Amino acid sequence: MKKCTRCLLPETVPGADIDAAGVCAFCRRPETSSAANAAATANRADLEATLRAARNTPGAAYDCVVPLSGGKDSLYLLHRLQADYGLRVLAFTCDIDLPPVAWSNIRRALRKLDIDHVVLRPAHGFLTRLFRYLLCNQEERGAVYTVSYVYAPIFEGAAIRLAIEKNIPLVLAGYSPGQPEPERMLYEFAPALISGEDWTPPHLAECGQFSAADLAHFYSPLQLPAGTRFPRYLAPYHAWDYDQAEVIRKVTELGLVQRSHHAN
């Protein structure tokens, strides 16, 4: 898949129109480029201030939750947050049939960095029903989009729940620029989305094929008591300079993966 060489926007985004030089239509607009540069500067400043303020959060055993998939970006994020910012990191993995190489990377990195880890394994029966329904009721963009747009809110919401439960102020995701789709997130999930919206996909709630227990896998702040303290959900790579080759080199050099080809 082609991505814009400036902002890493995927070609699949409507209106991307990546030209022969590898630049998307949005970056070719001077006013858009200027606004994007201003936003990037603001995001970098916000991220630096936020990470430094989160260190040794009073009343919490951890300063941040990091969703950990076993891929290079989440592995390197663990290292940077711990080594560069001194944060107490809690790694979190939602295990939906992760491949063996991902688990190998996870175990290796956690041992190397000495980081605590929480794993959630949703019930097999629920996942079977969920994926069967999604594959039989695909949206126009196909199976990958159909599944990922439901799977992602499960693990994102679970990470938010974990942060709330443990009074952790930040969830920091290893999304690289262009991930997830910009329509879902650019640097930060909107605070109103975390504190005021039910994340249950309406078509799942309305189809009659899922029980209340099934739907409870999706995060909903509407069920939480008044006064709940909600975390911020940020994507640091959206603010930092990002170089995929450098990330692969670093995780290999640090021994977070066994070989560079494991850093997918």
Locations of the language-model features?
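Short, glycine-rich nucleotide/cofactor-binding loops
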Residues: 64-73
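Nucleotide-activated chemistry modules centered on ATP-dependent adenylation/adenylyltransferase
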Residues: 1-64, 80-264
